Amino acid sequence: MTMQKGAWINFAALVLVNLLWAAQYPAYKIAGNNMESATLNFWTLLLASFLLVPLWLREKQKRKNVGRAFEWKTFREYLLLGLFGIVPPSVMLSWGIARSSASNAAILSLTIPVLMTGLGVLMLGEKLSLIRVFSLLLGLVGTLLVSTSDLSQASFSRSLLLGNFVILLAGLGSAFYNTYSKDLLSRYSELEVLIFSYAVGMAACAIISAAFETKPFYLIAGYSSATWFAVTVLGLLSWGVAMVLWMWVLNRIEVGQISTSIYLLPLFGLILSIVTVHDRITLPQILGGALTVAGTATLTLFEGRRSAHMTGSGSH
């Protein structure tokens, strides 16, 4: 009964995470109209860190064993996570969309759960079960039905090849961040992984902004209140609260189990557009939403309970 309750908690947390992540779509659109990519992500990560650091300090007070000497190995791990896990899905994604399209990015992002599952097998030795393959297919089909407008507007012509390739690399970076974070969570707390990877990401964004952008990150005058509100939403909700919950669930279940939940993101993006701008919803989109939820529930509820049952049986 306890395991079943835990599985439902994981499922509810993943639903909430994707709902908070969906808020980044309108927020990035508003902020991106005024701020360049590296500057935007620098301030987003900084605001998220302002939220996380007090929680981490409180954690250190409660758990004395969390504090440890910062060795070269630790620095190297967070440098790797920040450069290859934070910069690609933030700066590179924005750069790729500018040279491709948002519709192409939405379609190419469907590869992230598949990439996560594959990296989980290669990097962490996770098993590729039939349930995981079935859930991935279920979520993929559901997301394609939800994203019918993106499919109709997508274009993969040769002129957009570079942008599409960079978007794909951004998706790989996102998958790497989640998978490598799972490995680091065996040695560090959720807040440590987030804060130190964000610090590396901020440093990289600051360097990119100062070197290549027309208005460096430290020139903050001239941005509207709407821009700063959007950045605040991104920092506190999408990269703050949502990522804490995501890391908490990632520490409880395998990468392969959590991957399909990312297919909920387009569903909540659609729901938010219906609520805010009164977009019309179609029957295929309703069916797609149901399939996406079913795919996530299958992994977080059914496989988690099945794994726990097998573990319990093996211990007798």
Features from the language model and the residues they span:
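Specific transmembrane alpha-helical segments of multi-pass solute transporters/efflux pumps
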Residues: L20, Q24-Y25, V53-S109, L145, ...
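Helix-helix packing/entry segments at the starts of transmembrane helices
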Residues: N41-W43, I86, S90, A102-T111, ...
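Hydrophobic/small/kink-forming positions within alpha-helical transmembrane segments
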Residues: A22, P26, G82-V87, V91, ...
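Membrane-interface helix termini and inter-helical loops of multi-pass transporters
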Residues: P26-N34, N65-V66, A98, S147-L160, ...
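Glycine-/small-residue-enriched transmembrane alpha-helix faces in small-molecule transporters
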Residues: M1-F42, F156-D183, A203-I207, T311-H316
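Hydrophobic alpha-helical transmembrane segments of multi-pass integral membrane proteins
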Residues: I9-A13, T39-R58, L80, S135-V141, ...
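Hydrophobic/aromatic residues within transmembrane alpha-helices
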Residues: A31, L40, T44, G96, ...
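Hydrophobic transmembrane alpha-helices of multi-pass small-molecule transport proteins
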Residues: L52, L119, L128-D150, C205, ...
